[in-house]
Amino acid sequence: DQQIKQVADLKRDKKIVMSKEQRMSYIMYILLSGWDTYTLSLFSEELNVSKKVISDDINSIFKEFSKYNIRINRVAGHGVFITGDEFSIRRAMKSYCKYSIGNKVIREASDNRISVEDQELWINNFGQDNFEKSVEVIHYIEETYGIAYTDYSFKMLADYLCIQLFRVRMGNVITEDIIPEDENIKYSDIVDKVVEKFSSLSKCNFNEYEKQYIEILLASASVQSNTDLYKAISSDKEEKD
């Protein structure tokens, strides 16, 4: 519902003028979010450009999406839509959804390892509750295991977890193995606790493949070598609260 409202709000602003990059990001967001009712005419009307311009944009997007094995389908009389595996769609969302769909303004980041601009982007594109629950889970991991993620890893986790919750709540779940059978990441004990916490916060159920998604994220994340930094981050958070 929040996503529909955000797009509806953007539709009302007919004076908005976008660059090609912004237009493509908007179209990518609509397609990757699972909308299948958008025609070239509708994109043309909303973005105040010709159908020829939209067609050229979609051709450019086709080349980008092919890097993730995502196909753009154009059926006469129907909307433009994509097909591809769920894991690839999430990776593409992280790469290409670079402009805010909503207009919520953030004055201060909730953690000093992420920028106001990034937090604003995630909240406007993937929902404030999804963002807040994702950050709460990361803080839970850090507090439970006495670690502190690096700035880059904290940002990566927040982004991907936010996208995961956004997709799962829309009914788009991973349905196949994304970790090869011969690869053992050995994070299963931590993952179980994280999934339990995430499920409790979000009221969502995560299947075995969604657990693999979290396992990959945790295995990719790096922690600060200085444990005193973790205490400083925790102290800073308490002062802000």
Where are these regions (language model features)?
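A cross-family "folded-core" feature that marks the main globular domain of proteins
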Residues: 1-241
